[in-house]
Amino acid sequence: MNQSLLSEFGTPEQRVTHAIEALRAGRGVMVLDDEDRENEGDMIFAAETMTVEQMALTIRHGSGIVCLCLNEERLEQLDLPMMVQNNTSAYGTGFTVTIEAAEGVTTGVSATDRLTTIRAAIADDARPSDLNRPGHVFPLRARSGGVLTRGGHTEATLDLVTLAGFKPAGVLCELTNDDGSMAHAPEVIVFARQHDMPVVTIEDLVSYRRSRETLQAS
């Protein structure tokens, strides 16, 4: 990642700290991956604090594929199988079957309905019967170990929301340009400025976690 593009958002460590602080304050964060990977920016939010207004923003400016990042334990609690048994996608993105809240939604498409589905899925006492399948929310399985295991937006989302003190459940959606093309770093930075979001890279988060976990182990 071209670090000069991100200099206004601080050093790599500061960018992670700012992202954690933003999530704690109920704001969203823009997460960039490597230019040699997907080269995309995702809007991410803590699932516990996401508002209808933030969901509407996500749908309006994103790809439309609103994903709920969860760990293996939660997926087992909800009895959500993987979408396919043989995952041949380029980066092994862990899609499960899609979901809809069993109660409290209409078509499931609106910002309110999608947020209702997310809240049903992350409730402490959530059961498989609380969700219908298929639906309009796309759960993603995060790998154990987070970004130190897999450098994806899914793992970055769960790492950031847990570092911020929330349960391991985060919402992500890829940012798109007005013409429907994928937003890359320059467009992500403009969007972040407009919507008061910090920008952090997955590389930043990997370095942050390694440095702290090395200190804790010493």
Swiss-Prot record:
GO terms for molecular function: 3,4-dihydroxy-2-butanone-4-phosphate synthase activity; magnesium ion binding; manganese ion binding. Pathway: Cofactor biosynthesis; riboflavin biosynthesis; 2-hydroxy-3-oxobutyl phosphate from D-ribulose 5-phosphate: step 1/1. Mg(2+) 2 binds at residues 38, 153. Its cofactor is Mg(2+); Mn(2+). InterPro entries: DHBP_synth_RibB-like_a/b_dom, DHBP_synthase_RibB. Keywords: Lyase, Magnesium, Manganese, Metal-binding, Riboflavin biosynthesis. Binds 2 divalent metal cations per subunit. Magnesium or manganese. It catalyses: D-ribulose 5-phosphate = (2S)-2-hydroxy-3-oxobutyl phosphate + formate + H(+). The record marks 136, 174 as: Essential for catalytic activity. Homodimer. Belongs to the DHBP synthase family. PANTHER family: 3,4-DIHYDROXY-2-BUTANONE 4-PHOSPHATE SYNTHASE, GTP CYCLOHYDROLASE II-RELATED. This is 3,4-dihydroxy-2-butanone 4-phosphate synthase. It comes from Erwinia tasmaniensis (strain DSM 17950 / CFBP 7177 / CIP 109463 / NCPPB 4357 / Et1/99).
